[in-house]
UniProtKB/Swiss-Prot annotation:
Residues 26-45, 66-110, 130-149 are annotated as: Disordered. This is AMP deaminase. The gene is ada1. InterPro entries: A/AMP_deam_AS, AMPD, Metal_Hydrolase. It is an enzyme of class 3 (hydrolase). Its cofactor is Zn(2+). Its EC number is 3.5.4.6. It is found in: Cytoplasm. Substrate binds at residues 321, 390-395, 590, 665-668. GO terms for molecular function: AMP deaminase activity; metal ion binding.
Length: 831
């Protein structure tokens, strides 16, 4: 057995340990002489290896004797210092649930899960003859509890725990201020009215009527103005604006970068990385053990559920771009149909005149017969790997930008009619499938203020409403392109163009009525572009947006902050007015710098891709603890940045991260008319996912999505744990909640007042230990004079059970004795 395995059996002590300054070379000699004789050139805080092993042998005796006294076959039994695992202790873990800010967090272990815990077979803690855990209460009984490590490392562990807790507190601060929490959005209230209200699978044609939409007016005197930092601030009235007192507190960019620097320092700290890596390895190993023991039980549970299987549980495509919503075959069939039915329709202005659709294809020297999948050439093959520039060209049918303008743009000479018709066909497919939902990303570029009104008019006029669909607004990070083209002068103009119309419509929806109605189906913002672009640090201190007038693009962290800050101010105002709020779900961790993940951890509700988390174990562990949503697209990554077999999706899933599957760009990556099912099918074949695994991923996608809470309850059950609706066995949900609860408790326990003995109490225990053994040398003590014997003697002596005696006391006793010896030796030298 190696040292680490032995350490796992020794509970830690929350007490200061003072490193030794001498190296023991002969553990068999008198130790007072050894300390005095040790050469000063070999100063070290550690014992000699053999000597330390002999010290720890005392603890091994304690564990063995404790097991043989009360249990069978040497298995440890319940003791006063190690409370038995029970459901009552599980209920005491509710205080850790506040640490979660992700969707569907709430109470991790409700009554349903607690009642099911006893059926989970996890023989990590042996109990008598059964040798099976009935339930797990907290970190004291968690087999992976780091408290059981050597007391020598308790101080270092405490610092790591505090660092983790501080990072989580920073995230919670930003999420709380921006109203991105689970129940912060008014749409999650039971009184929220969904219009048009139509169940999935029902024909929604003609249900939407813009005249039936209520458009409120101005409600109060609140005003908005952009401050000198580039943030739209909301004021109670003009007097508050003159006084410079905004209604809502927005974290400053200085505070943000200070917090970001701390997070980056913590993530690069060696001990923190090692600790996080070990915890993640433990979580993965625990999952493997769980599956070995419970796989067939899960299968039996799912077979008892009538009507439900993977195909008819709700699943949401949480990351898909609207301009690539249809696969190649669908787009090809649509283009051929238009060329056949309306060839003489004027579609584009070129060379001083309008061209018909037939004239456009004549100029390309193509006929309907010539068109094929290969001719379109929109699928991302091997030539796009690590070539994001080539991938962007795949959005052009036949390599022609004019065809993209005609068929895949909302703002063109035909007002985006072709794209609207294609979108309706996809909506029809979703309605037919009934159990599939999608959240489409649609672009606002920030080039001018009219973009919002044009987009809203396109949605409303074409009646693009579906009970299966919600929208996100993606903002491409293309300031450098706009600057070089002369479209904008400073970065502040981009920020103003993106957010000012939203503040206008929040103040008075009558100024942009169509935009007001459209925003009710918008759930958040996304930040998109090639993350692998180099980010040059041109300033020692970043200027405010009004002073950012160079041709270089701001870094990712800068972009994300100004999207977050303005969205935070907007959300606060919209919630006061009773309007829906937004979340930030950017593309992050697909390529480029891992620092992007730190920015997203602080500011965003969830991310897309996240494959670079595999390189930063500390951040990955934080992602697990806070259950931050990750929408992963292995097929997309396989074509662009990472081979499918190297994708960390399966590892994330095993460890318990909140992951879901999404399609990203069906036009470039999918071959079938059901791209989401295709994504699941490939993952199931490559990773050998079970039906329960896929149903759990589908459930995760619903929880990650921005659909209204009343819809989620209809799809998943009131507490999101109804096996009759999710087809996920309660035993699986109980395992996930149980493991997460213990990990959170492990961190929280070390930032609360310690229940372990103080330094003064520890001194008394050590002196009593020395006195009762009759010698200050643990090696010369009787084999039966161990921690258990000491504890029993003290109980007889003063009538109390001293649960503070623990395996490892001999080591601490030796360290304290040596410290005292060295102190007295130093004093003698001075005298």
């Amino acid at each position: 057995m190696n040292m680490e395995q032995e350490d796992d059996q020794v509970p830690a002590v929350a007490a200061e340990t003072v490193p030794l300054k001498r190296y023991v070379t002969n553990p068999g000699a008198n130790r007072d002489e050894e300390v005095a004789a040790a050469p000063s050139s070999q100063d070290t805080p550690y014992f000699d290896y053999a000597y330390e092993r002999s010290l720890r042998h005392q603890d091994a005796k304690f564990l063995a004797m404790n097991g043989t006294q009360n249990g069978r076959d040497g298995l440890p039994s319940k003791s006063p210092r190690r409370p038995s695992v029970s459901a009552s202790t599980v209920r005491n873990s509710d205080d850790v649930n506040h640490s979660k800010a992700g969707p569907g967090s709430g109470k991790l272990l409700n009554d349903t899960l607690q009642s099911k815990i006893s059926s989970i077979h996890m023989p990590h803690v042996q109990q008598g003859d059964n040798a099976v855990v009935s339930s797990v209460g907290g970190p004291e009984t968690d087999p992976g509890n780091m408290e059981t490590t050597d007391p020598l490392f308790s101080d270092e562990l405490a610092e790591i725990y505090l660092s983790i807790h501080k990072c989580m507190d920073m995230r919670h601060k930003y999420i709380r201020v921006s109203l991105q929490g689970e129940l912060d959005n008014p749409i999650d209230d039971d009184s929220w009215i969904i219009y048009p209200d139509c169940k999935e699978g029902e024909d929604d044609t003609g249900l939407f009527n813009f005249a039936d939409c209520k458009i409120p007016g101005i409600e109060n005197e609140m005003e908005y103005h952009m401050d000198h930092q580039g943030i739209f601030q909301v004021y109670e009235n003009d007097s508050a604006y003159i006084a410079g007192t905004p209604s809502f507190h927005i974290p400053t960019i200085r505070d943000y970068y200070i917090d970001l620097e701390f997070l980056l320092s913590a993530s690069s700290d060696g001990p923190s990385k090692s600790f996080s890596f070990r915890r993640l390895q433990y979580l993965e190993g625990r999952w493997n053990m769980y599956m070995l023991l419970n796989e067939y039980q899960e299968l039996a549970d799912t077979k008892k559920v009538p009507h439900r299987d993977f195909y008819n549980v709700r699943k949401v495509d949480t990351h898909v771009h609207h301009s690539a919503l249809a696969n190649q075959k669908h787009l090809l069939r649509f283009i051929k149909a238009k060329l056949r039915k309306c060839p003489n329709e004027k579609v584009i202005w070129r060379d001083g005149k309008f061209l018909t659709l037939q004239e456009v294809f004549d100029s390309l020297k193509l006929t309907s017969y010539d068109l094929s999948i290969d001719t379109l050439d929109m699928h991302a093959h091997t030539d796009t790997f690590h070539r994001f520039d080539k991938f962007n060209l795949k959005y052009n049918p036949i390599g022609e930008s004019r065809l993209r303008t005609i068929f895949l743009k909302t703002d063109n000479d035909i007002n985006g009619r072709y794209l609207a018709e294609l979108t309706k066909e996809v909506f029809t497919d979703l309605r037919t499938q009934k159990y599939q939902m999608a959240e489409y990303r649609i672009s606002i570029y920030g080039r001018n203020r009219e973009e919002w009104d044009k987009l809203a008019a396109w949605i409303i006029d074409n009646e693009l409403f579906s009970p299966n669909v919600r929208w996100l607004i993606q903002v491409p990070r293309l300031y450098d392109v706009y600057k070089k083209s002369g479209i904008v002068e400073t970065f502040e103009e981009v920020v103003r163009n993106v957010f000012e119309p939203l503040f206008e419509v929040t103040k008075d929806p009558r100024t942009h009525p169509k935009l007001h109605v459209f925003l009710q189906r918008v759930i958040g913002f996304d930040s998109v572009d090639d993350e692998s672009k180099p980010e040059r640090r041109t300033f020692r201190k970043f200027p405010y947006p009004k002073h950012w007038d160079i041709n270089l693009n701001p870094p990712y962290s800068y972009w994300l902050y100004y999207m977050y800050a303005n969205m935070t101010s907007l959300n606060s105002w919209r919630k006061i007015r009773g309007f829906n709020t937004f979340v930030l779900r950017p593309h992050c961790g697909e390529a480029g710098d891992t620092d992007h993940l730190a920015s997203a951890f602080l500011l965003s509700h969830g991310i897309n891709h996240g494959i670079l988390l595999r390189k930063v174990p500390f951040l990955q562990y934080l992602w697990y603890l806070d259950q931050i949503p990750i929408a992963m697209s292995p097929l997309s990554n396989n074509a662009l940045f990472l081979a499918y077999d190297k994708n960390p999706f399966l590892t994330y899933f095993k460890r318990g991260l909140n992951v879901s599957l999404s399609t990203d760009d069906p036009l470039q990556f999918a071959f079938t008319r059901e791209p989401l099912i295709e994504e699941y099918a490939v993952a199931a074949q490559i990773y050998k996912l079970s039906a329960v695994d896929m149903c759990e991923l589908a459930r995760n996608s619903v929880l990650q999505s921005g659909f209204e809470r009343q819809l989620k309850e209809r799809w998943l059950g009131v507490d999101f744990q109804d096996i009759d609706r999710t087809n996920v066995p309660i035993i699986r949900l109980a395992y996930r909640a149980l493991t997460l609860t213990q990990e959170i408790a492990l961190v929280n326990k070390h930032v609360q007042p310690s229940k372990h003995p103080s330094n003064h109490d520890l001194e008394e225990l050590i002196h009593k230990y020395d006195a009762m053994t009759g010698t200050s040398d643990p090696l010369s003590a009787s084999p039966r004079t161990n921690d258990a014997t000491i504890s029993s003697r003290l109980s007889l002596h003063d009538g109390h059970d001293h649960g503070a005696f623990f395996p490892g006391l001999s080591v601490i006793s030796e360290r304290r004795r040596r410290k005292d010896s060295m102190a007295s030796s130093s004093q003698d030298l001075k005298d």
